[in-house]
Amino acid sequence: MQSITVALDAMGGDFGPRVTVPAAVQALSHFPELKVILIGDQSLITSQLSQLGTSTSSRLSILHSEKVISNSEKPSLALRNSQNSSMRMAIDLVSDNEADACVSGGNTGALMALSRFVLKLLPGIERPALVSALPTISGKRTWMLDLGANVSCDADSLFQFAVMGSALAEEHLGRPPRVAVLNIGAEEIKGNDLVKRCAEMLSQTDAINFVGYIEGNQILHDVADVIVCDGFVGNVCLKASEGTAQLFIEKLKTSMMASTIKGWIARKLFSRLFNELKTLNPDQYNGASLLGLRGIVIKSHGSADVSAIVNALGEAVHEVKRQVPSRISDRLEAVLLERHY
């Protein structure tokens, strides 16, 4: 079995080593091929390992860093002051081929800027895009991009997002994914010039299985496998859907506590419903991919807990196995060749 090494920014996110270290330990038991390099304050990481009753090994190592990029730091400032930071060192390991992928829950803007600066973009890609899987009513997943890396885009960028998202989704699904553009209506006359131009470009491309427009209320209804939008719209949709899912789960918990139904009937009724709603938990889909780079970078939620970070590490393992950057490059080359002729 070929090993896969992931550089984990242990200081990234709201809770730092308190969640990243136990997540790394858990991930090693989930993925036998995985090796993790924890980058961050060595004393804090070692302390967390001691509390877990474990230590470094051939599959778990520590790389000490002196600095942490704060969530409030501007990307331009992060670029200038990134040396010896846990995030920069994690990305550098990928660039130096000492790690196959990196995972960070840190500052999203800084992560995008540093990744683009260090790893560079794939040929033909103008901007990287942030993509993540979302749950659907059928129990399957749909991938949505961009989720905030680019708050304003042109039609060419949206087209490239569609190509990248299609390549990623196909590696998960094993079939050509259905690609749709997010719009305010399903009719061809609806929408602004941006989405209309993107839809026109996609409809003329045989390499993309374009199924037309999708409205916001259809995002979680398994109508499309890949949903394309600019980063402003995508981030708002993502946060709204996550908040709605959390609302349902919390409401159910409150109802369970207040219920007058007793005994095994209550346990049966609420446990079944709770298990169904747990599939909407955003933590199960943690691990947004920064696509378009010459390396694999996974963005974890800043507020992610241990299980959510394990999922992000799992996404990194999957993308390394499937060689996602190469797949995207091949797909883009085929699409550009088709458009040229």
From Swiss-Prot:
Catalytic reaction annotation: a fatty acyl-[ACP] + phosphate = an acyl phosphate + holo-[ACP]
Main location: cytoplasm
Gene Ontology BP annotations: fatty acid biosynthetic process; phospholipid biosynthetic process
GO cellular component entries: cytoplasm
Taxonomic superkingdom: Bacteria
Keyword entries, A-Z: Cytoplasm, Lipid biosynthesis, Lipid metabolism, Phospholipid biosynthesis, Phospholipid metabolism, Transferase
A GO MF label: phosphate:acyl-[acyl carrier protein] acyltransferase activity
Pathway: Lipid metabolism; phospholipid metabolism
Transmembrane segments: none
Coiled coil feature spans: none
Cytoplasm is among the record's keywords: yes
Intracellular or extracellular location(s): Cytoplasm
Tagged with keyword ATP-binding: no
InterPro entries hit by this protein: FA_synthesis, Phospholipid_synth_PlsX-like
EC annotation from Swiss-Prot or TrEMBL: 2.3.1.274
Disulphide bridges: none
Gene3D superfamilies cross-referenced by the UniProt entry: Isopropylmalate Dehydrogenase (3.40.718.10)
Family annotation (PANTHER family): FATTY ACID/PHOSPHOLIPID SYNTHESIS PROTEIN PLSX, PHOSPHATE ACYLTRANSFERASE
Family: Belongs to the PlsX family.
Oligomeric form and interacting partners: Homodimer. Probably interacts with PlsY.
Biological role stated in the UniProt entry: Catalyzes the reversible formation of acyl-phosphate (acyl-PO(4)) from acyl-[acyl-carrier-protein] (acyl-ACP). This enzyme utilizes acyl-ACP as fatty acyl donor, but not acyl-CoA.
HAMAP family cross-referenced by the UniProt entry: PlsX (MF_00019)
Name under which the protein is recorded: Phosphate acyltransferase
UniProt organism field: Vibrio campbellii (strain ATCC BAA-1116)
